[in-house]
Design a protein with these regions (language model features):
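N-terminal auxiliary segments of SAM/dcSAM-dependent transferases
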Residues: 1-29
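C-terminal alpha-helical "lid/dimerization" subdomain adjacent to the S-adenosyl-L-methionine
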Residues: 22-26, 34-52, 173-236, 241
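Conserved alpha-helix/loop element of class I SAM-dependent methyltransferases that forms part
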Residues: 45-73, 83-87
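Class I SAM-dependent methyltransferase SAM/SAH-binding core
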Residues: 73-131
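Short conserved loop adjoining the S-adenosyl-L-methionine
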Residues: 129-135, 151
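A short SAM/SAH-binding and catalytic strip from SAM-dependent methyltransferases
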Residues: 139-153
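A short glycine-rich, Lys/Arg-flanked "PGG" loop and its adjoining helix->strand segment in the class I
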Residues: 154-166
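Core SAM-dependent methyltransferase catalytic element
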Residues: 215, 222-276
């Protein structure tokens, strides 16, 4: 199988040679940025229809996460066309962030169709650099089908931790790699170099659950889901939530240096994705 992968990758490359040549010459990326929002505007409603009940179950937990303002301050990371707006509870104060400014046209349409929400602003920036958002300013961050295409999931999750208030929650829905060594994983490896160009940087073989485990959340609830479109190579999905920890006792009593605290390795608490 290890020998077969590069041979099949070469075959796919030859079949899609014009695309790879355009990418090499720097012509493909601007074109992709322009057409990708139109592609998502077609695909995301179809995807939502297939996973609607699960999305409603996941995002129903947002309602009880109000902050000091009495409303939920929600950041949608990689907001795309705004396909998730319909699932958010009324009154959320939504900030949208996406590195692709061409999504704004579709966001405006989604905002008009979902007037139960309060929209703050649209920030054009990558998830690795959210400097325009203040520390601890968000009660909730939503990230759906985003960590597959960012340059550094680790840096994105660090930024998520920074903008979340203590006790704030990251809600995620991501596609991940098939089991290592399976035929499905082999085909993901074969298609990935070409798929990254078609899907605006989307990687098929990321083990995103490991990035979440290493991100120092105090609690993680995660559930595995089958892909909504079995004819695509995107593989299984993971959905769930991750809670930002409150300041450690050591940080809270730093003014008392004489007090010695035992160092305990961080381990997130894993719970089934049920209830609120």
């Amino acid at each position: 199988m290890d020998v077969l992968v590069p041979l099949l990758q070469l075959l796919v490359l030859l079949l899609t040679l014009p695309l790879h040549l355009m990418a090499l010459l720097g012509c493909w990326q601007p074109l992709c940025k322009s057409y990708f929002p139109y592609l998502m505007a077609v695909l995301t409603p179809k995807c939502n229809r297939k996973v609607e009940s699960k999305k409603r179950e996941l995002f129903s937990r947002i309602k009880g996460l109000t902050g000091a303002s009495g409303k939920v301050a929600l950041l949608e990371l990689g907001c795309g066309t705004g396909a998730n707006f319909q699932f958010y509870p009324p009154g959320c104060r939504v900030t949208c962030l996406d590195p692709n400014p061409h999504f704004e046209k579709f966001l405006t349409k989604s905002m008009a169709e979902n007037r139960h929400l309060q929209y703050e602003r649209f920030v054009v920036a990558p998830g690795e650099d959210m400097r325009e958002l203040a520390d601890g300013s968000m009660d909730v961050v939503v990230c759906t089908l985003v960590l597959c295409s960012v340059q550094s999931p680790r840096k994105v999750l660090q930024e998520v931790q920074r903008v979340l208030r203590p006790g704030g929650v990251l809600f995620f829905w991501e596609h991940v790699a098939e089991p290592y060594g399976s035929w499905a994983f082999m085909w993901q490896q074969v298609f990935e170099p070409t798929w990254k160009h078609i899907g605006d940087g989307c990687c098929l073989t990321r083990e995103t659950w490991k990035d979440l485990e290493n991100a120092q959340f105090s609690e993680i609830q995660m559930e595995r889901q089958p892909p909504p479109f079995k004819w695509l190579p995107v593989g299984p999905h993971i959905m769930g939530k991750a809670v930002k920890s409150f300041p450690s006792p050591k940080a809270l009593i730093s003014s008392f240096p004489s007090l010695q605290l035992e160092q305990v390795p961080h381990q997130p608490i894993y719970l089934p994705l049920r209830g609120t």
